UniProtKB/Swiss-Prot annotation:
Residues 24-55, 209-282 are annotated as: Disordered. GO terms for cellular component: large ribosomal subunit. The keyword rRNA-binding applies. Belongs to the universal ribosomal protein uL2 family. One of its GO terms (biological process) is cytoplasmic translation. Part of the 50S ribosomal subunit. Forms a bridge to the 30S subunit in the 70S ribosome. The gene is rplB. GO terms for molecular function: rRNA binding; structural constituent of ribosome; transferase activity. Pfam families: Ribosomal_L2 (PF00181), Ribosomal_L2_C (PF03947). The lineage of its organism: Bacteria, Pseudomonadati, Myxococcota, Myxococcia, Myxococcales. The keyword Zinc does not apply. InterPro entries: NA-bd_OB-fold, Rib_uL2_dom2, Ribosomal_uL2, Ribosomal_uL2_bac/org-type, Ribosomal_uL2_C, Ribosomal_uL2_dom3, Ribosomal_uL2_RNA-bd_dom, Translation_prot_SH3-like_sf. This is Large ribosomal subunit protein uL2. Residues 24-33 have a biased composition (Basic and acidic residues).
């Protein structure tokens, strides 16, 4: 993948970049592997907003992805690399030897015509899926299961990868894209390689309208709201936030304050990710 740049014919075009989609080989999805998806607008069944800044966007059909990679020992040929509007990575259409078709996340280095397979004794090459116990230390992986047979849950976004760091007893240690080191059962499956669309994080949208195409609504500052809407709201003219510490709309500290509260899975985190400049506690 490469990024395409435009001439500055307008303020929006100046600095705008888009993917050149050179790796895409098929424009229309496999109809039997798609299903409709309804927009929620960020609302739950009661109509209350549970996730802000969601709404609108282009209509999409959901591509059914094979997260489990459970057809062990059955070779599959890569028939196409496709765009998926529901995720940042590209997807690959696999034609299995028994006639079945499935979508998987496309890793870097997987091309049309390649043969992929899953199982405990398969080769260590991009796109093949194996139990972690069969993967050598230091291997780059993605689409990692949290529980055996549950399907890939971690490391699924464009350009991301984890690295197998150690094996000890029933568990293996994996370094996540965030830098966190996490323990996972060795019977869990993972796919070899780094995910495609590596330069996705460097794409510049250029204008607000592109965010709206993607279904992202504007993020309004709390300071610009009324007191009824946000703790920072109100005041005459450009007044300050009036708090000793910036807070979220619900009163939680918002500058790097830890909000994770899941003691059940704390034991699986070997080392936390290092805080970046934007999430350093203040």
């Amino acid at each position: 993948m490469a990024l395409k740049q435009y001439k500055p014919t307008s303020p929006a075009r100046r600095g705008m970049t888009v993917s050149d989609f050179a790796e895409i080989t098929k424009s229309k999805p496999e109809k039997k592997l798609t299903k409709p998806v309804r927009k929620s607008g960020g609302r739950n069944a009661h109509g209350h907003i549970t996730t802000r800044h969601i709404g609108g966007g282009h209509k999409r059909r959901y591509r059914v992805i094979d997260w489990r990679r459970d057809k062990d020992g059955v070779p599959a040929k890569v028939a196409a690399i496709e765009y998926d509007p529901n995720r940042t990575a590209r997807i690959a259409l696999l034609n299995y030897a028994d006639g079945e078709k499935r979508y998987i996340l496309a890793p870097v280095g997987v091309n049309v015509g390649d043969t992929l397979v899953s199982g405990e004794t398969v080769d260590i090459r991009p796109g093949n899926a194996l139990p972690i116990k069969a993967i050598p230390l230091g291997t780059v992986i993605h689409n990692v299961e949290a529980q055996p047979g549950s399907g890939g849950k971690m490391i699924r976004s464009a350009g991301s990868f984890g690295q197998l760091m150690a094996k000890e007893g029933l568990y293996a240690q994996i370094r996540m894209p965030s830098g966190e080191v996490r323990k996972v059962l060795q019977d869990c499956k993972a796919t070899i390689g780094q995910l495609s669309n590596v330069e996705n994080s460097t794409v510049r949208l250029g204008k607000a309208g592109k965010s709206r195409y993607l279904g992202r609504r504007p993020t309004v500052r709390g300071l610009a709201m009324n007191p009824v809407d946000h703790p920072h709201g109100g005041g005459e003219g450009k007044s300050g936030q009036g708090n000793p510490h910036p807070v979220s709309p619900w009163g939680q500290k918002t500058k790097g304050q830890k909000t994770r509260n899941n003691r059940r899975t704390d034991k699986f985190i070997v080392s936390r990710r290092k805080p970046g400049p934007r999430n350093t506690p203040q």
